[in-house]
Amino acid sequence: DEVELSNLQRQVVHGDDDVGRKKVDSAAEFVSDLNPDVDVERHDLRVSPDNVEALIDGYDFVVDGTDNFRTRYLVNDACTLAGIPFSHGSIFQFEGQITTFAGGDDSPCYRCMFPEAPPAGMVPNCATAGVLGVLPGTVGCIQATEAIKSVLGAGDLLDGRMVFYDALKMEFDSVEITKKDDCPVCGDDPAIDSVHDVEYTASCAITRDAEPAVSDD
């Protein structure tokens, strides 16, 4: 994935001179320049069922900032099966949502909320609908806060809670997320024991019917 001019208004890692460069190289150099004591490991590849387990192996926390349902389900399944906590963040126009899946016995996962992806074309992407330039940074800072808290064992994570941010109204709301007993990944009788049990296509579908487990806080 290469840096494009349209990327520059919503992040601080890449600059105008980086247009056309690989994002992984530009981002790694930015972090190294900011703090040369940080050990940056580059992964110049597309996440897939064949490599996701090796990619997350050895990490204490994963930050999911992906922009498509296929990869979100893949990251969820891999982290949940491996017992690695991870933060989920997504954005749309003027709104963002963030939660942390801690992987505990009572912790829900992404499939507890959304067992399957919405039909193709139902949710517009950011290229079509647009996104407020500062919104990714706002959501990303909250995710970074969750990562630091998790590593330090400090405070309370957004485990079992989803935070919704409305930039136009400058409001934060949260809803409770409940673990589902029939979740195909973290439920009592899981149907998914490996990322190779799922065909990560448009729907990321499995054979079990379930309803989203989100309730008003």
Range-by-range predicted roles:
Residues 1-217:
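Adenine nucleotide-associated cytosolic modules
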